[in-house]
Amino acid sequence: MSSTPAQENGTVNGANAAPAPAPAQTTPTPAPATAATPTTAPAASANGTAANAMKPEASSNSSNSASNGTTPAPSTTPTTASNSSAPAAAQDESLVCRWAECNERFTSAEVLYEHICEKHVGRKSTNNLNLTCQWNSCRTTTVKRDHITSHVRVHVPLKPHKCDFCGKCFKRPQDLKKHVKTHADDSVLVGRSPQDQNGGMNGAYRAQAPVHKAPSGFYDHNGHMRGTNQVPFGQPHQNGQASYYHAQYPASQPYHAPMYYPAQTMGGQRNDFTGHQAAPFDARKRQFDDLNDFFGSVKRRQINPTSYESVGRALMPLHAPLGLHSGGLATEYMAQPPHTLGMASAHHPLTQHYYLPPMPNLRTKEDLQQMDHFLEQMQATVYENTAVDMRHHSPTYATRPSIDPYHGASLASPLSATSPHSAGTPAVTPTPSNMSYTSGHSPSTSSTSLSPTSRHSSTPSVSYPTLPSRPGLPYPSTSGLGSNFTHNERRLSGGVLQSARRAADEADRAPTPKASEQATVSSPSEDSETGDVNGPETYDDWLQHMRVIEYLRQGIRARLERQDFDEDDTSRIDPMVLESSDRNQQQRNQQQQQQKSPNEPTAAGPSAPEKPLYPVLPRIN
């Protein structure tokens, strides 16, 4: 142990290097030398460095003596460094720019890629755009800068696009897109939202996410998922309805998430969405157009408000579109702002609402007032033309254009309402001498009760002369089959229709109702075969006409009360356009006046002989 101070003194002072071998001989035991060496070597080197930097020999000697006991350490350190430097060297080689003769080294692949794009590829704005790849011997030429920058990723070890399913990285987005298609049949895709496929789900949750079997559902024409009862996130839904992405975001912020998979519905929770299938937009738009066409026909006076038949034909197409019992199109078509989206349930599809602009035929206040007045006339016409017994709601009500509404043929009796044989046939009770099959009194095609079949089936209620159904019975008298009117003795010649007669003479003298214009001379057998084509109008149709008119009037009055109309058509035009049109009109008026003013004095004075349009030959003497 006495050699240690001598070694320290020799190292610190550096006066003489000879005492170094003597301590080496006086240390026969390896244990103290090994224990003292690591302790003295750092101290010696430290003291030597602090005391005098001009003695390299002493420092080297002390270093050699200190390394005698720690021989294996240097041998181990180079091996580890060589193993770790191999991949580092390979990585450094991949981060060298091989564009032409650049050979510049970079610390990361991102910096290398930006260097190539900015310095070597360049830009068109800086007039240094290069569309040919010069990486080693590539020489690939493109037509756009985006193409060459995408191609450069092949040479650069930059793989920013990572697959969320297998963790594999790719250099270009198109490579990742092709790779993702290989996972299309894997079960790992099931239960993953589009947001998760883009990297929205972290790795911890991805590891815990359960794997489910692919559902066998399908989307119907309204965009609703049908035919499966399995939910990826373990939340069963009602009615067997599948919802892939259920409650991933709070209900207070419904549309902060992507809108291609809405998780909640509007208008409250519905227990059965299959019964709430909104009509297609095209069908509802067509119904709105029918209602608008009706108002347009009224404005163009194409509907006669005093004719019940014209009113009925015009109102018939509106029975279904209006939907009086369900609050249909009339309320939705009125001008109103679009509905705001309100979320109430996360188990059912999105409710479909449509918003259409106001009708073009009902824009101004004058249009609404005229339409209300016209509908009032139509309502009075429908009310006055009711020929139905209100107490019985009889289905035998019929209004025919050829019969006066106050005639007995159009009035229903209690017998005809309760008789099973006379259903749909009005009770006709004329005398045998008042009707015949002569011209002018032939039964019209709209009267089914005058056919032989109807006469036989309704004998108790119709007092018509019947022909014998069995041979041997006497025929009725001629007086019962002929006409008793003296002014109707003229007979028609063959081939001449009833419509050939003058309607004025017939209206002045004939007390019986006029035949319809469509009716021709026909036999009773033809009437029995054809019968009533359109069928009698029922009480429900008449009542529906009244409801439609009242419904339209209520909507118009509501718009007038809330002043939901345009003040004037000119208010919808730009004032600058109106001023320019007024100036153009004034200029045209001035030009017309200037053209007329030179001609007025000429017309007042003597007219000058007009010059002939052809050459005049000289007169020969």
Curated annotation (Swiss-Prot):
A motif (YPX[LI] motif 2) lies at residues 614-617. One of its GO terms (cellular component) is nucleus. Residues 1-87, 395-539, 566-621 are annotated as: Disordered. Residues 15-87, 409-423, 436-465, 583-595 have a biased composition (Low complexity). Residues 502-511 have a biased composition (Basic and acidic residues). Its main location: cytoplasm. The keyword Transcription applies. Activated by C-terminal proteolytic cleavage by signaling protease (probably palB/RIM13) at neutral to alkaline ambient pH. Keywords: Activator, Cytoplasm, DNA-binding, Metal-binding, Nucleus, Repeat, Repressor, Transcription, Transcription regulation, Zinc, Zinc-finger. Belongs to the pacC/RIM101 family. This is pH-response transcription factor pacc-1. It comes from Neurospora crassa (strain ATCC 24698 / 74-OR23-1A / CBS 708.71 / DSM 1257 / FGSC 987).
